[in-house]
Regions:
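Extended, charged catalytic domains and RNA/DNA-binding interfaces, predominantly
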Residues: 1-232
Length: 232
């Protein structure tokens, strides 16, 4: 069971881990060259070498005790799908641009062009595409498949008493002019929702908390940890 441990309740030990990790399933990480997924992130945390975007090898000096892969819930897995010419998102104009992008600058231009698709209400202060906007760049089948990849990787790598994994993701609540506060949502065990609550569902953290309360009524426990106010 993910999140479980064999350490007794009377034991007091210092454990070291990371609850904020992005992989190629996150749009910002993908645009910056990351292609490895949750499996590689967990292997790295346990001391295994993994390839870096530059072609070198990355290896942590001391393995961690616990970790959660917390990819962005918004557009989870969509960037890799856009980069695939055989997928639906890969046939979108921005997908075609991404496939043909040769430089980091070009990828960043596509990244900013996608703000309208993250935020069709224009809360962030970027261009408001209007009330008739159709988000043809968001395929929830892709999002749910990526979410399942996150779940499966956590379950595969969990070794109670040796290395503990948590299923989680990042929720970003936008405010005017991109004033935001990021929250890592960490689930207690293996019972998790079918898909994460994302900024496309609501920009209000109160709505996130209400969603978590509804999950709790179903026996699904989660904790939202604020971690970053960048852009605020």
């Amino acid at each position: 069971n993910v999140g479980s441990s064999k350490v007794g309740s009377a034991s007091r030990v210092a454990l070291f881990g990371d609850l904020h990790i992005h992989t190629g399933l996150s749009i910002d990480a993908y645009m910056n060259g990351t292609r490895e997924g949750p499996d590689a992130a967990y292997r790295y945390a346990q001391g295994e070498p993994i390839p870096s975007p530059s072609g070198s090898t990355l290896q942590i000096l001391k393995p961690l005790d616990f970790q959660a892969v917390t990819d962005h819930g918004g557009f989870l897995g969509m960037t890799a799908a856009m980069d695939d010419p055989n997928s639906g998102p890969g046939k979108h104009p921005l997908g075609i641009r991404l496939q043909n992008a040769k430089t980091h600058k070009e990828r960043l231009e596509i990244y900013y062009a996608m703000y309208d698709y993250w935020d069709p209400d224009g809360v962030t202060g970027f261009t408001n595409p209007g009330p008739d906007f159709v988000n043809d760049l968001l395929d929830m089948r892709v999002v749910r498949s990526a979410w399942q990849e996150v779940i499966d990787a956590a379950e595969r790598h969990n070794r109670p008493g040796e290395f503990t994994t948590f299923i989680g993701y990042e929720f970003t609540a936008y405010g005017p002019s991109i004033r935001n506060l990021h929250r890592n949502v960490i689930f207690q065990g293996s019972r998790v929702p079918r898909q994460p609550f994302r900024e496309q569902d609501s920009h209000n953290p109160e709505d996130l908390w209400d969603w978590m309360d509804r999950l709790r009524a179903q026996g699904i426990e989660a904790l939202a940890i604020p971690h970053n106010s960048n852009g605020s």
